[in-house]
């Protein structure tokens, strides 16, 4: 299982900026599928606070539509893999893609997460 966070405004799409998104949705993802774990409001937290919130939820991978280089470095230093999309992507589509990857041939960074989680 991996834990994935999506910065989202509407809870359906990856459509929020890391620094200004008001919430993120955390999902547990396995080869069988995914389950919504929690919706986390970010409030007025700055970069460090947002990274801590992701860490507190046990997030392995974080998706957003925009993140600055300094913030991305802080996310990586927090042992979270950031993924940035330039366009809005449906959360459901990304969850299905992740489940399929886990079930078949996960890329090295996902394989490493799976091995660490045991």
Q: What are these model-derived regions, one by one?
A:
Residues 1-44, 49, 53-57, 77, ...:
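Non-catalytic interface/targeting segments
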Residues 64:
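Catalytic cysteine-centered active loop of the rhodanese-like fold, especially the PTP/DSP P-loop
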Residues 67-73:
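Short, glycine/polar-rich helix-capping loops at beta-to-alpha or helix-loop-helix junctions
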